[in-house]
Regions:
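Domain-level detector for trafficking modules
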Residues: 1-66
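C-terminal, extended alpha-helical scaffolding domains
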Residues: 45-281
Length: 284
């Protein structure tokens, strides 16, 4: 998983040249221990409450989306994330099922071995012994398949669930910038109204000071508008890259899964084919 994560990072043009990434890859000494990793650490709780607060803020302030593209992509992202979550849950169930099959096969083979050791019929005992070997082979195949499914299927899909969360966080950051922009525009309106009232009241000194504050607020609003436009364009570019990579990766994930599954089924078939002749010598 770490290898896939680092490959994804160095494949990004901007992140590839990041000094922290370069240091991580070239550092020869032991890496520093992670901090605030506890589930209930103070830093973790602060991040959680901040996320909850931002979520409620987004609910409270509705964004009138002027770009149809973002409206469509956010809806599409929600649907894709839900589909990936379901697929991840199914892949986890598949892994657990294969592990259970491996464990059951091991238990069954031990029982067969005990049965073979106390069987009076030599031919039947030999057949049970070969069946024990067959079940041991089958259990080992399911164990290897569960490990491959974990690495190539479940973890890979789980990684994309996290990537969809990051994508939604990017949409959320755009919403936050828009919200700050709207707040800045509202602040300009308030200051202009205050300046007008002061001028009508003859308080020219205070009105002049407020005029400077208004100009500063206008500059801030203009900067936020530019920032909003930039983040919107950047998200569009990154989303296009993400979609291209996602399609390529999902195809590779499914192909690897099917290849390993076919290989496992071939091994199972060979195990049963080796055992099949032994049944012919069992006395009836």
């Amino acid at each position: 998983m770490l290898e896939r994560y680092m490959s994804r990072i160095v494949a990004h043009g901007a992140l590839r040249s990041d000094c922290d990434v370069r240091d991580f890859l070239t550092m020869e000494v032991e890496l520093p221990k992670a901090t605030s990793t506890s589930t209930l650490s103070s830093a973790g709780m602060k991040r959680m409450f901040k996320s909850v607060g931002e979520a409620f803020s987004k609910i409270a302030v509705h964004m009138e989306e002027g770009d149809r593209w973002f409206e469509q992509m956010q809806s599409q992202t929600d649907e894709q994330e839900e589909a990936m979550k379901r697929m991840h849950a199914i892949s986890e169930t598949l892994v657990h099922t294969r592990r259970d099959l491996a464990a059951i096969g091991e238990t069954f083979s031990k029982s067969l071995s005990l049965l073979a050791s106390c069987e009076e019929s030599t031919a039947l005992a030999r057949c049970l012994s070969h069946l024990t070997e067959c079940e041991e082979t089958i259990g080992a195949v399911w164990e290897r398949q569960s490990e491959k499914d974990t690495a190539d299927l479940s973890e890979a899909i789980g990684e994309y669930v996290s990537l969809f969360n990051s994508l939604k966080a990017a949409f959320g950051e755009r919403h936050r910038v828009w919200q700050n922009w709207q707040t800045a525009q509202q602040n300009i309106t308030k200051k202009r109204e205050q300046k007008t009232r002061l001028e009508l009241a003859g308080k020219t000194d205070k009105a002049a000071a407020l005029r400077a504050e208004t100009e500063e607020a206008v500059q801030k609003a203009d900067q936020l508008e530019v920032q909003f436009g930039r983040i919107s364009e950047e998200i569009k570019k990154e989303y296009a890259k993400f979609e291209a990579t996602r399609k390529r990766d999902l195809k590779a994930i499914i192909v690897r899964f099917l290849e390993t599954l076919v290989k496992s089924q071939e091994e199972l078939l060979k195990a049963w084919q080796r055992f099949a002749p032994e049944t012919a010598v069992i006395p009836v």
